[in-house]
Amino acid sequence: MSEYIVRALSPDTWDGFAGLAQRHNGVFGGCWCTYFHTMHSEKTFDADDNRSLKRRLVEEGRAHAALVYDGDESVAWCEYGSPEELPNIYHRKQYEEELDVVPDYRITCIFVDRRYRRKGLSAFALQGALDLIAEADGGVVEGYPHDTQGKKKSVLYSGTRTLFERAGFTFVRTKGPGNCVMRRTVP
């Protein structure tokens, strides 16, 4: 097995992030992991625009992710950030109506290179994000994974409830069909 390492997304690691996204056609139709950064009315749905937006956010320090590297190649990421950085979440209206605690951080997207799937890299990337959050003084962290209830699902961009439970998160409540709110405090 390879020896994986985590690096924070930054201008210095942009090329690694971009390489991974490009190998997968910008990810999910050219999203470039920008979906949660913008509200629907602000979206262009254009891969080149999304790439430019993501790069600008990285350069401005407003996009965060734990990048997993195998040697010099980025092979996975876990996106995280404050609710201000990542305002767009699925089932937001329901989420806000039932909000009891405003988190310091959100984990919104986990992506693994197709060549590296089923090797535990989602968990490695999630732990990498939690470690980076701890380095930034921690706080309340929420994730919004799919609650698959043991069923197979082809797209799991925000991880699974089981993945988050194994990382020490607690189930808070459901959020729309098939999704839930998970929470953990990182010291």
Where are each of the predicted segments found?
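Aromatic- and Gly/Pro-rich amphipathic surface segment
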Residues: 26-59
